[in-house]
């Protein structure tokens, strides 16, 4: 085989792979995803009562209002373009200050008793909207007090919004975004 024939074969193979893997395959997968999983393919968007996009089920948002459940703290200030966890180790004084600040904030919001670690430490992505059912239930009395509701009513809402994965070893969890939206829709 000559150099010219080898180059031609390489260019044709490159062009074919570029066309198939760079254009046709992504378009096909996007089309299939849009048909089979339309909500997820568009970002699992959430809508308010006016039909406007209020966020995504997949990305936590900062919550300052005591009438809502608090998500996990974010190491990146809930900035999705800079997602990532904290590199601070357990012996770092900055980390200890962040944990103590989170604990104080939860106490100020009315949370009593032991506080689960996930409420004071950021997740690996810094944007995780999910909490264990226990972490949500710890906040239920404070949310109920801020909303002038019964604790049992708020706890029932948490239980109604728990999610169970197909894997038997994965604990149940609650999506804070959908739970907070449900608080306004009760």
UniProtKB/Swiss-Prot annotation:
An example Gene Ontology CC term for this record: plasma membrane
GO MF, any single term: P-type potassium transmembrane transporter activity
Membrane topology designation: Single-pass membrane protein
Keyword Membrane listed: yes
Residues annotated as transmembrane: 9-29
Subunit-level organization: The system is composed of three essential subunits: KdpA, KdpB and KdpC.
Role summary: Part of the high-affinity ATP-driven potassium transport (or Kdp) system, which catalyzes the hydrolysis of ATP coupled with the electrogenic transport of potassium into the cytoplasm. This subunit acts as a catalytic chaperone that increases the ATP-binding affinity of the ATP-hydrolyzing subunit KdpB by the formation of a transient KdpB/KdpC/ATP ternary complex.
Protein name: Potassium-transporting ATPase KdpC subunit
